């Protein structure tokens, strides 16, 4: 029977070939730190009690490996939660801005948008660019970049973020926009 003797570095290489590099680096730093910070008599005491050579180093290695995995998972979870928090905050601020703009629309601006909402169109149709349409473009409610001529009329698309809020706050019975409250 032929025995195969493997170098410890080859064994470690095979173990860590499937591990992410970041986790491996955490593990090495934790392992070396634990070995350096542990008192000198602990390895001797453990070896005497158990009788297996270098069991202390293997134990510390296993501990470092477990800590590295948990640190890696915790940092990934914390990072994902932080990103979700920032996204929710950005969406909330954007919704508040949209609601604020809709709340402060003049009567003429509101009527222009009501005409489009009443007909179910996602754009405003006009024969020329009136001052209140220019104001809606400046507010960002209408998109001038994608406006197009349709015969004698100009079509100004309503921005998507405003469209969803306008549809939610539109009252078709009274043909008016009832702004929803801004969140606090």
UniProtKB/Swiss-Prot annotation:
The keyword Transmembrane helix applies. It comes from Escherichia phage lambda (Bacteriophage lambda). Has a role in the prevention of superinfection by phages that are insensitive to repression. The gene is sieB. The chain crosses the membrane at residues 23-39, 55-71. It is found in: Host membrane. This is Superinfection exclusion protein B. Keywords: Host membrane, Membrane, Transmembrane, Transmembrane helix. It holds the Pfam family SieB. It is a multi-pass membrane protein. One of its GO terms (cellular component) is membrane.
């Amino acid at each position: 029977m032929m025995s195969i003797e493997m170098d410890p570095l080859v064994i470690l290489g095979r173990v860590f070939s499937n591990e992410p590099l970041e986790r491996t680096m955490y593990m090495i730093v934790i392992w070396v730190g634990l070995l350096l910070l542990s008192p000198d008599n602990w390895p001797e005491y453990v070896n005497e009690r158990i009788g297996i050579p270098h069991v202390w180093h293997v134990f510390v290695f296993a501990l470092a490996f477990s800590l590295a995995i948990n640190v890696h998972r915790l940092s990934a979870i914390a990072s994902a939660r932080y990103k979700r928090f920032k996204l929710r905050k950005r969406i909330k601020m954007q919704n508040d801005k949209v609601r604020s703009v809709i709340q402060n629309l003049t009567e003429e601006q509101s009527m222009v948008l009501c005409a489009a909402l009443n007909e179910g169109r996602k754009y405003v149709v006009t024969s020329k660019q009136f001052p209140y349409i220019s104001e809606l473009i400046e507010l960002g409610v209408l998109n001038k970049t994608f406006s197009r001529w349709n015969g004698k009329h100009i079509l100004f698309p309503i921005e998507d973020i405003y469209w969803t809020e306008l549809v939610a706050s539109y009252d078709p019975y009274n043909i008016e926009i009832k702004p929803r409250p801004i969140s606090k």
